[in-house]
């Protein structure tokens, strides 16, 4: 599971694309398609290699009717239709972290299109914390083995001929990763649009100072790097947006633009977090997402349940 080889179908990719994937000096521009889930303000992505049929899916959403206890896959089906319609081969299903505000559709996407489910290798830390909170027994593995691949900081992998790099950017959670794919960085919940600022840092294992340093790591990328958000809430009623750039964020981000001191950010972020309630779907989301998007195992009658721990968060 913890192997690090880059899996590439060499027969399917032209030599020039392989050379580009191996050479960090070559600027690559993937095609990026966004899918907005209005119920959770989440943006999922299909990332395509223009030089082959390969693609990846990032942060797919499973629909949950919380009051009725019903799941469905309308949003995931839109992604499936896109991939099939463009005759793409899915190589990766990437989770930027264990999300606390929506349930992952990664297993559904994998069963429908193939691909490998991947997350950062600090997932074991998150599983240990929430395994205790949800009183999971020994059958719940706390080693990340529910996922097909665990990325360490700096791991390089390929999407067809695209070079992708996994960057550990903790602070929102201990396991958050940013994925730099060509000239595009998928930042998860670490960074928001300039008028949205930054993610909260008060979940178990979160830390505002660590978050600041992770954001500055992202903002040390080349100024033209495209940044793709996992969430947007349309501050002030503006239309939903999900793409900015390093240059825009360094100039305009209300929390972490150039000139903001680390200590000032920490003071602001911690004070703001004390005013925030928990996300509406945090309890079901964590139980599912720490299992790589699988529901908890069924009981003797084949029924599946989600727990509601009292005063645990």
Protein language model regions, located:
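Accessory terminal helices/loops
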Residues: 9, 13, 17-31, 122, ...
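Generic preference for hydrophobic
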Residues: 32, 93, 117, 166, ...
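Extreme N-terminal basic, low-complexity initiation segments
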Residues: 2-8
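Conserved beta-strand hairpin/beta-sheet module of binuclear metal-dependent hydrolase folds
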Residues: 27-89, 178-187
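Active-site HxH/HxHxD metal-binding segment of metal-dependent hydrolases
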Residues: 55, 62-162, 252
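Conserved S/T- and glycine-rich ATP-binding loop of Class I adenylate-forming
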Residues: 47, 96, 169
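Short, basic and Ser/Thr-rich N-terminal targeting/leader segments
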Residues: 28, 40-43, 144, 160, ...
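Metallo-beta-lactamase
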Residues: 53, 60-66, 134, 143-146, ...
């Amino acid at each position: 599971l913890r192997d690090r080889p880059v899996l590439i179908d060499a027969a399917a990719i032209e030599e020039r694309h392989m050379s580009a994937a191996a050479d960090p000096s070559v600027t690559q521009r993937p095609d990026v398609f966004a899918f907005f889930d209005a119920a959770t303000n989440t943006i999922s992505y299909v990332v395509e290699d223009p030089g082959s049929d390969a693609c990846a899916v990032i942060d797919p959403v499973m629909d949950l009717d919380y009051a009725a206890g019903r799941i469905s896959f309308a949003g995931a089906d839109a992604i499936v239709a896109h991939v099939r319609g463009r005759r793409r081969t899915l190589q990766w299903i990437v989770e930027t972290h264990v999300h606390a505000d929506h349930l992952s559709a990664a297993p559904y996407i994998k069963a429908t299109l193939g691909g490998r489910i991947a997350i950062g290798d600090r997932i074991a830390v998150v599983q240990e914390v929430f395994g205790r909170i949800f009183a999971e027994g020994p059958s719940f593995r706390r080693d990340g083995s529910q996922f097909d691949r665990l990325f360490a900081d700096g791991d390089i992998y390929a999407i067809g001929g695209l070079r992708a790099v996994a960057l550990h950017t903790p602070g929102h959670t201990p396991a958050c990763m940013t994925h730099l794919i060509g000239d595009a960085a998928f930042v998860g919940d670490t960074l928001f649009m300039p008028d949205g600022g930054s993610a909260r840092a008060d979940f178990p294992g979160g830390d505002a100072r660590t978050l600041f340093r992770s954001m500055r790591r992202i903002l040390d990328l080349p100024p033209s790097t495209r940044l793709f958000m996992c969430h947007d809430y349309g501050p002030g009623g503006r239309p939903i947006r999900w793409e900015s750039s390093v240059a825009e964020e360094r100039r305009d981000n209300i929390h972490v633009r150039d000139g903001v001191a680390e200590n000032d950010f920490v003071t602001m972020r911690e004070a703001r977090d004390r005013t925030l309630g928990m996300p509406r779907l945090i309890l079901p989301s964590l139980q599912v997402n720490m299992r790589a998007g699988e529901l908890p195992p069924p009981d003797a009658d084949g029924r599946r349940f989600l727990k509601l721990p009292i005063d645990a968060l």
